[in-house]
Design a protein with these regions (language model features):
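Acidic/histidine-rich catalytic neighborhood of metal-dependent amide-processing enzymes
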Residues: 152, 156-229, 269, 428-429
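Short, solvent-exposed loop/turn segments at the edges of secondary structure
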Residues: 104-106, 206, 227-229, 291-293
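N-terminal signal peptide c-region/cleavage motif recognized by signal peptidases
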Residues: 25-29
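Acidic, glycine-rich active-site loops and adjacent beta-strand->loop/helix elements
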Residues: 127-129, 184-191, 215-217, 240, ...
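Metal-dependent amide/peptide-bond hydrolase catalytic core
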Residues: 33-37, 79, 84, 215-216, ...
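Bacterial N-terminal signal peptides that target proteins for export
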Residues: 1-18
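Acidic/His- and Gly-rich active-site-bordering loop/insert found
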Residues: 33-151, 169-173, 177
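Soluble non-cytosolic domains of exported or imported proteins
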Residues: 43-47, 63-71, 154-157, 161, ...
Length: 429
């Protein structure tokens, strides 16, 4: 069987799209019942995975909680070392500072497993949560029926646990036909990954396939596209003066800000998914003082990476056309998270995942090509990627970022372990 897949590895290195199409075709011609050894092992890992989830949930790891993110990074690194990986804890060095980026950013865990093949595969998830220290008491780990509840359990500690146990399953199966299996987990995803984004992009560019383990939603689907998130900050400097006695001596920053906002009101392009909406504005200190400063913030969304670049260029051109020559206008544009764009390589691998789910497990899996909701780190992995990038390999669940209802569905543990293991094995041949 390995000889039949040997040319596939060569194709994967030179032409990821051709490889993805070939893999999809091969999977369609080899439909079978579940692989008994993989299924049995996945079932054996259900309780250990829940034990891992309990440990992860009980580590409070908010993005800005350095003690917590360092603790969870050490825990994850230890688990990966147990599986024989070359593991390092990386401190971010190339930081993309956003308006709300904290001074100190948490670490990444990077592990590499070398095999005897040639395919390069990467698994990603994030260890941080949106929650503050002390909130664990309100959402401790617990199991109620077919659901496991806990702080950050769906977003994204289930993804961390799935990767750890997928790696363990591969080792127990004695499988190492890949070239390299890379694991990368960061602890700043919930604050737009300012420290990890460059590393994710660099490593993503080296891979033949990247699987991201954010949750599979309520229906267990995988995602090929996510929306990009941007932000614009406009600052106008004028000159204060008495609004009643000498208004002509001032430079009204509010007038200039209003002019700027109005001339940018038509930059949205709904037909392509580009949206720009000004949402916050502030000016002045007192009713009787001409405002010397005015600021505004905008939310931007895009479905294509190039649209953010074009939008920023258009906005910068607009601010040069001022109402008041004496005013100073500054515009800062942030790409908080780029969009993930579907391509043929990701479509083909997603089809393969669907085939495994339907023909081997008797389960349905949706593939979402239209971006919905927030962005994820999969988009950073895809920025310079040559191969497929697929989001949503995690457990089904609900309630991310909620106060008391975050959970994952227990009946998705075995299928997701099976799927991740099968996909890695198929792509490694």
């Amino acid at each position: 069987m390995r000889s039949a897949f040997a040319p596939l590895s060569l194709m994967f290195r030179s032409a990821p799209l051709a490889l993805a199409l070939a893999v999809a075709g091969l999977s369609g011609s080899a439909l079978a019942a579940p692989k008994a050894d993989i299924q049995a092992l996945a079932q054996k890992h259900q309780q250990p995975l829940l034990d891992t989830l309990r440990d992860l949930v009980h580590i409070e790891s908010g993005s800005k909680d350095m003690e917590g993110v360092e603790q969870i990074a050490n825990y994850v690194a230890g688990k990966l070392r147990e599986q024989g990986g070359k593991v390092e804890i990386l401190q971010p060095t190339d930081v993309y500072r956003l308006g709300d980026t904290p001074e100190k950013i948490g670490p990444m865990v990077h592990a590499e497993f070398k095999g005897k093949g040639s395919s390069r595969i990467m698994l990603i998830a994030h260890m941080d949560t949106v929650y503050l220290r002390g909130m664990l008491k309100d959402q401790p780990f617990r199991i109620d029926g077919e659901r496991a509840y806990g702080l950050g359990i769906a977003d994204d500690k289930q993804g961390v646990a799935l990767i750890l146990h997928t790696v363990a399953m591969l080792r127990q199966l004695g499988f190492d036909n890949y070239g390299t299996l890379t694991v990368l987990m960061n602890s700043d995803e919930e604050i737009s990954s300012p420290g990890a984004r460059s590393t994710i992009t660099r490593m993503g560019a080296e891979q033949d396939a990247v699987f991201s383990f954010e949750g599979g939603g309520t229906d267990g689907g995988v995602r090929l596209a996510t929306s990009g998130i941007g932000a614009a900050y406009l600052k106008v400097e004028g000159k204060a003066s008495h609004a009643g006695a000498k208004p002509e001596d001032g430079v009204n920053a509010l007038y200039e800000l209003s002019h700027q906002l109005l001339q940018m009101k038509d930059l949205s392009k709904p037909e392509t998914g580009l949206k720009l909406n000004w949402t916050v504005a502030k000016a002045g200190t007192n009713r009787n003082v001409i405002p010397a400063e005015a600021t505004a913030q905008a939310d931007a969304r895009a479905l294509r990476v190039a649209d953010f670049t074009a939008l920023e260029q258009a906005m910068q051109a607009k601010v040069g056309h001022k109402l008041l020559d004496a005013s100073k206008v500054q515009l800062k544009f942030e790409v908080r998270r780029p969009p993930l764009e579907a391509n043929e390589a990701s479509r083909s691998l997603a089809k393969q995942a669907q085939t495994i789910y339907s023909d081997e497990l008797g389960l349905k899996m949706s593939v979402m090509e239209k971006a919905t909701g927030g962005g994820t780190d999969a988009a950073f992995a895809a920025l310079k990627a040559k191969g497929a990038v697929i989001e949503g390999f995690g457990l089904s669940g609900y309630g991310a970022h909620s106060n008391d209802a975050e959970y994952v569905q227990l009946n998705t543990i075995v299928p997701r372990l099976y799927l991740a293991t099968r996909m890695i094995m198929d792509l490694s041949k």
